[in-house]
A protein has these predicted regions:
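Conserved ABC transporter NBD signature motif
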Residues: 60-74
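Catalytic Walker B motif of ABC-type/P-loop ATPase nucleotide-binding domains
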Residues: 162-166
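Conserved ABC ATPase signature
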Residues: 137-141, 145
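Helix-to-loop junction immediately C-terminal to a conserved catalytic motif
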Residues: 52
Length: 228
């Protein structure tokens, strides 16, 4: 299996004087599901943001698809805690926004979308059980429904690596379990790598591997694999 994420002697945080976490060695392969747990403020979101290339490491090596530069357009999908949806637009518009990551700029400007893009958008909306809300403005949806829109948007993007920060929050337990199963089957069927930050320990342990960020003696977080 080819490595999608490789981190060696990685230090992350906001400045050299405020290192949040130190990661000696982390390798994540294609098609693998990895979960990250840990107390609030310990560096879970910061780690995801570094992998997404939204934040630079303080030190060490972090390779995504074997490169330290920014991944290709649309190759990495990120579901943040703050969803970033266009709330006055429809569910369809928001999911389409993810799908056009792989289209040309010219096509996107003029709205000339290939049928396969339209099909992907509708498939993603259907998987998240939102077909009946497809033409509804996002602002009229519940918090849980909006979260499902964000997940559908990332699925439609066709990313090879999906990073999800508490992506099941605001969902009731039954819906969260359903969405987890759909996402699990989707990434496994398409050999997509999924890295999730998850507060529910039992659900986190359903991943192929589970890691915990925990405080060391010098108050810098370290990443430890959790036995399942």
């Amino acid at each position: 299996m080819s490595e999608v994420v490789s981190a060696v002697d990685l230090k992350i945080g906001y400045s050299s004087s405020s290192v949040l976490a130190s990661i000696d060695n982390l390798q994540i392969d294609k098609g693998e599901i990895v979960s990250i747990i840990g107390e609030s403020g310990i560096g879970k979101t910061t780690l995801l943001r570094n992998i997404a290339k939204l934040q630079k490491p303080l030190d060490g090596e972090l390779l995504i698809f074997g490169s330290s530069s920014y991944p290709g357009r649309g190759d990495v999908g990120y579901i943040p805690q703050k969803l970033g949806l266009v709330k006055h637009e429809t569910v369809y518009f928001n999911v389409l926004e993810g799908a056009i990551c792989h289209e040309s700029i010219v096509k996107s400007i003029f709205g000339l979308h290939d049928q396969k893009v339209v099909d992907k958008v509708e498939e993603s909306i259907s998987l998240m059980k939102l077909i009946d809300k497809m033409d509804s403005p996002v602002k009229h949806l519940s918090g849980g429904q909006q979260r499902r829109v964000a997940i559908a948007r990332t699925m439609a993007q066709g990313a090879k690596l999906i990073l999800a920060d508490e992506f099941l929050s605001e969902l009731d337990d039954k819906t969260a379990d359903t969405v987890w199963n759909v996402m699990h089957d989707y990434v496994k069927a398409n050999q997509i790598t999924l890295i999730i930050v998850e507060h529910n320990i039992e659900r986190a342990k359903l991943a192929d591997r589970c890691f915990k960020l925990e405080r060391s003696e010098n108050s810098i977080s370290i990443l430890v694999e959790v036995e399942k």
